[in-house]
Every structure is written in structure tokens, then in C-alpha cells.
Amino acid sequence: MNGSVGWADAGVLMPYALWKQYGDLRVLESYLPGMRRYARFMQKRCGRWYPTAKRTGLHGEAKKYLSNCGQAYGEWAEPEDVHHMTWKDCAVPHPEVATAYTAHVMECMAEIEAALGDANAAENYRQFAMHCRKSYQALRRTPAYSLDTDRQAQLVRPLAFGLLDAEQAAFAKKRLILALEQYGWRLGTGFLSTPLILDVLSEIDIEAAYRLLENEEMPGWLFMPKNGATTVWEAWEGTATKNDGIASLDHYSKGAVCRWLFDTMCGIRVSGENHFVIEPHPGGHFTCARAAYNSVYGQVESGWQKVGGGWKFSLAIPANCTASLKLPGKPAVLLEAGTYTF
């Protein structure tokens, strides 16, 4: 693979995620030279000719900022009845995926450079990201890459990365719900979009996110333990997969759903060195939930339980920390260290 997006850009996205989680600029300073080299590599691939590239029908400025070059894994491991993957998927560029990640990485680099004090570099990355977004929007207006699709990944990704204009975004949200309804509220995403789908659905309707989470049929998270799994499978089909290339039974990618359980279901989010945001979202058929996060200051806890027609919330904030509490339908309050029940 030659710079396969979704994998190779971990060199930018991992330091970015660590900085967002812990607020430590030293991580960015340490990896900045490599991140800049990779960002430049991504920029140089835009608009280039490649022998196995699929025709997109784009020209001019739209083609100039389209990434349609190099081999890539693409979405990888979507359910077989959603997209049957063959060796050809790894032999050709994936312009929808690659342009989306190019725009996303450029936005991350803009934030990184701004945080480190280089305003000119930040603006250059921001401008490149804007051009990539416009190319992406143009691509999604073509018949071959239309937003009118049942492939959930191709709807989740642009919504998660903020790549669409207002009209396209409104259509994509409705089309995603329709795709889920037509697929029986089962997961149709692969490696790249599975970690994003519950976040996107939470923005649309939190109950839609819970409905997908609670699905026990294949493809679905709960189908695995329901069928005796003690690890996370690479393929949604597990041992029944017909593709030997994705037959691992201990492949944690789809386990990324656990982040949503922490930061949305139970609502624990780090927001600075010793400050947290606690914003739980009860829903679905769950009657209780609880999560604990071991911070450097101690354990942060957030939980909720259904009581009668309402909810009982409990939380714990370690010493020398504060938390902004945002409960459903109530104004935010700032809390000092201690244990609380609401």
C-alpha cells in the first residue's frame, strides 16, 4: 500500500487525538516534522494521474483537489451483502474515501499549526481543506458517487467530517436513516466508518443511535457475543465470512464503539488538564448505565438509572478537578470535586 488513507494518516490523526484528549502540546511538537511531511505527501497526490484510477467526470478546479491516486484499502470489511470486496479493491484508488480523508487531515493540520503558533501554515492547510471539500462535494454530485446510496459508510463519512454543503448534508442525514431502515437497522459500515456512525446518528436523533447499538442480528455489535464471541471479529460475518482476507476473529477495529459508550451514553469527556464535561444521554431500552475513567487525578464516574418515569444521575469528580454537568433538558452547572446524585 502506498499511503492508504485511513491507515497511513494515523501519523497525523493519532498525535491529534492525543492532544485533543490530554491537551499536551509536546505530543504535537514531537511529531510535527513527520506530520508536515505526510500532509505534503497527501497534497501532492491530489489531481495526479494514476493508471488504475476510476474516471470521475470531474475537470478543472474540482479535479485539481481530488485525491484519485495510489492504492488503498478503501472502507474495508463492509458486510458482504453491502459491498463484496475483492483483490481489485486494493489495486485501485478510492477517490471518495481518499478525498474525504485528505480534507479531514488538512483540517486537523490547520488546528495543530494554530495551536503551535504558526498562523500562516494553519491558513494554508485551511485553504487546502476548503478546496478538497469543494472537490468532494462535486464528486458526490456525479452519478457514480451519488449521495443517494444504501452504502452507509459513504453517508457517515462526509457527515462526520463536515464535508457537505447544507443541502447535501440535509439529504445525507435523511438518506442514512432510510438506508438503515432498508437494512433492518443493522450495521453496514466497515473499518473506517464504524467508529463514526453512532456519533453521526446522535446528531440526527439519539434514539436512532441506540436502535442501531441494540441490534442483535448480523451485522451488529451484539451479534458477536450473542453467538459466543469473546473477541471482536474483523468481518461482521465472523467464521461465516467468505473472504479469507478478513477472517481474523481478534481484530479490535469495530470495538471503537466503546468510545461512544463513554463519551455519549455515559457522557464522560476530558476538556482540559483537570476539567471534564459530564453530559450523559440515556436512551433506547437501557434502564441503567455506568462508566468510569481513570484520569491522572483519580477516577471520574458517571452513571444513570431509570426511576419511575425519569432518570437518576450519579457522578464522582476527583480531587483538584472540576466538571461541567449537562443533564438532559437542564442548564449546565459547574461542579467541584465530590460525589453527586441528581
Task: Walk through the language-model features, giving the residues of each.
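Alpha-helical repeat scaffolds
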Residues: 169-179, 213
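Amphipathic, well-ordered alpha-helical segments in soluble domains
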Residues: 7-14, 101, 105-108, 132, ...
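Non-catalytic C-terminal accessory modules of carbohydrate-active enzymes
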Residues: 127, 131, 210-342
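Active-site acid/base region of carbohydrate-active enzymes
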Residues: 21-98, 113-160, 167, 267, ...
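Repeat-solenoid scaffold signature
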Residues: 182-220
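Alpha-helical support elements that line or immediately flank enzyme active sites
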Residues: 12-25, 154-164, 194-203, 322-324, ...
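Solvent-exposed loop and edge beta-strand segments that line ligand/cofactor-binding
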Residues: 1-8, 83-101, 138-155, 161, ...
